[in-house]
Amino acid sequence: MSRYRRPRFKKIRRLGALPGLTSKRPKTGNDLKNQSRSGKKSQYRIRLEEKQKLRFHYGLTERQLLKYVRIAGKAKGSTGQVLLQLLEMRLDNILFRLGMASTIPQARQLVNHRHILVNGSIVDIPSYRCKPRDIITAKDEKKSRTLIQNYLDSSPPQELPKHLTLQPLQYKGLVNQIIDSKWVSLKINELLVVEYYSRQT
């Protein structure tokens, strides 16, 4: 299954705010009316919508998300918490959380077009898993720095999560630690996502 490329507003009307996909937000009043008209949701639909919310926010294919769920299931600790940590530590998401890109799709383009270095080396894989003490910088070229400066200027002001540090004048971000789940920017019940996949197997 491919990544979602159709109009984004339809998704946020149904699933709620998806900051990684778009900065647009649904009109709350209309959405509540639509939801009440649609009647009570089944447990399956509730789990499905949480899964879709996670997938669209991080810009993953169904196969990619399933792979992350399986990796999280084999790790120590809560599967849902580990799943969120894996997704939050992706390079494209780290760039988004730093404000060096306005959305995760924009961050993915920066990485794909080789504008980003990790610890001094170009990384062109958006799913690259960042680690504590990683240093993320823009390539030392005018085009790369101009792109990132534009994103930094246009990104809505928000509190930087504690696991990251931004040095905007140097176009540099630092990963201080693995993210704590309370700093995840998406409102999500990750246990419902894990339940969704456990019932599919």
Swiss-Prot record:
One of its GO terms (molecular function) is rRNA binding. CDD domains: S4. It comes from the Eukaryota. SMART domains: Ribosomal_S4, S4. It holds the Pfam family Ribosomal_S4. Residues 15-44 are annotated as: Disordered. Residues 89-150 form the S4 RNA-binding domain. GO terms for cellular component: chloroplast; small ribosomal subunit. It is found in: Plastid, Chloroplast. InterPro entries: Ribosomal_uS4, Ribosomal_uS4_bac-type, Ribosomal_uS4_CS, Ribosomal_uS4_N, S4_RNA-bd, S4_RNA-bd_sf. GO terms for biological process: translation. Keywords: Chloroplast, Plastid, Ribonucleoprotein, Ribosomal protein, RNA-binding, rRNA-binding. Belongs to the universal ribosomal protein uS4 family. One of the primary rRNA binding proteins, it binds directly to 16S rRNA where it nucleates assembly of the body of the 30S subunit. Part of the 30S ribosomal subunit. Contacts protein S5. The interaction surface between S4 and S5 is involved in control of translational fidelity. This is Small ribosomal subunit protein uS4c. It comes from Cucumis sativus. The lineage of its organism: Eukaryota, Viridiplantae, Streptophyta, Embryophyta, Tracheophyta. The gene is rps4.
